[in-house]
Curated annotation (Swiss-Prot):
The gene is rpoZ. One of its GO terms (cellular component) is DNA-directed RNA polymerase complex. The RNAP catalytic core consists of 2 alpha, 1 beta, 1 beta' and 1 omega subunit. When a sigma factor is associated with the core the holoenzyme is formed, which can initiate transcription. It catalyses: RNA(n) + a ribonucleoside 5'-triphosphate = RNA(n+1) + diphosphate. Promotes RNA polymerase assembly. Latches the N- and C-terminal regions of the beta' subunit thereby facilitating its interaction with the beta and alpha subunits. Its EC number is 2.7.7.6. The keyword Nucleotidyltransferase applies. GO terms for molecular function: DNA binding; DNA-directed RNA polymerase activity. Belongs to the RNA polymerase subunit omega family. It is an enzyme of class 2 (transferase). Pfam families: RNA_pol_Rpb6. This is DNA-directed RNA polymerase subunit omega. GO terms for biological process: DNA-templated transcription. It comes from the Bacteria.
Length: 70
């Protein structure tokens, strides 16, 4: 089961693709530099889970280049 739930994530970011790419980039950053944590406490022990929790909490948002906004 995904924690946080997908509907909670899509309430913050309306694209599953953006959620996945943002979480992957943030997870890589968390894995390389653990001191960059944005939350006081995480439910997940894995970097991807931590990144998803940060997205659900509104601590990070995807960056979309202007040329893709149409």
């Amino acid at each position: 089961m995904l924690n946080p739930p997908l509907n909670q994530l899509t309430a913050k970011v309306n694209s599953k693709y953006l959620i996945a790419t943002t979480a992957a980039k943030r997870a890589r950053e968390l894995d390389e530099r653990r001191e960059t944590a944005l939350l006081d406490q995480y439910h997940s022990s894995k970097p991807v889970g931590k990144a998803l929790e940060e997205i659900a909490d509104g601590k990070i948002e995807p960056v979309v280049p202007k040329e893709y906004l149409g």
